[in-house]
Amino acid sequence: MPALRVLLRVAAVLVFLAGLVLFVFPLRTADWFAWTVVPPMTAVFLGAAYWSSAVLEAAGARSAGWDRARLAVWPVLVFTTLTLGVTLLHLDRFHLGPEHPPLARTAAWAWLVVYAVVPVAMLAAAALQLRAARSPAGPRSRVAPGLPGGLRLLLGGVAAVLGAAGTVLLAVPARAAVLWPWELTPLTGRAVGAWLVGLGVSAALAGAAGAARTARPVAASALVFVLLQVLALLRHGDALGRSPAATAGLAAVLVAVGVAAVWLLVLGRARPPH
C-alpha cells in the first residue's frame, strides 16, 4: 500500500503544522492561520486534536498491513470530508481575500486545497487497498483474541458520546454551543463537531479491532489527545466558567478516553499466549 503510506505521511505533516499554529500560537490565528479562531481555548483544543491525529496518521503510514492502517484511514476520511463541508458553509470566514495578512491568506488557500484533495485521494487509496485485500493471493491476518468486554463497552460508550455530540454541533451549532464549556461560534462549533465525529469513529474502530496490538496506534493518539487537552485547560481554563455541568461532562469524557487509551496500551504490550 505505497500510495496510502505516502498519503498518510503527507497528512501527518499537514496536521502537525496546523496544530503548531493552533496549539503554540493560539493568539496569532488572525495573522497565521486559515481563519481566526476565538477564544484561544478553541484554538488549543483544535490544535491538540490535530497533533494527536498526526500520531495516528504516522503510525498508519508505518503499518505493515491494512488491519492497522485502516484505523487511521477511516477517521481521517470522515474528518476531512466533514471539514470540507464546514469550510464551504463558512467560506466567508476564511482569510482568502487580499485584505488579510499574506501568511494567513496562504494558509487559507492551502487549507481549501488540502480539504478538497485529501478526502478524494484518501477514498481512492482506500478503495485500491480494499480491492487488494480481497485478492485471494493477498496476505491474510492471523486471527487474534478480541478485546475484553469491559474495554469494548468503554470504547463503544466513548464513540457514542463523541459521535452524538459532534453530530449535534455540526447540525445545530448555535443551539448546541450553549451546552459547551466555552464560547463557540457556528464555524468553531462545526469545526469541533467534525473532530468529535472523527474521534468517535476512531474509538468505534478500536473497539471493533481484533486485538489490542492492532489498536495501539489509536490508543497512543488518544493518550496524546488527553494529555494535550489537560495542558490546554491549564493554559486557558479560565474560558470554562460559563457551564459547570458542561465542564464536568468534558472532564468525564477526557477521563474515559484516557482510561481506554491506557488500557489498550497495557494490553497491547502483553505477549500473546502461545
Residue ranges and their predicted role:
Residues P75-L88, W195-L199, V218-L234:
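Hydrophobic alpha-helical membrane segments
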Residues L27-W35, F94-L103, A137-S141, A174-E183, ...:
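Membrane-interface helix termini and inter-helical loops of multi-pass transporters
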Residues M1-L20, R131-A209:
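Surface-exposed interaction/gating patches
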Residues M1-P75, T87, A104, L179-P181, ...:
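An N-terminus-focused feature that recognizes amino-terminal "leader" regions
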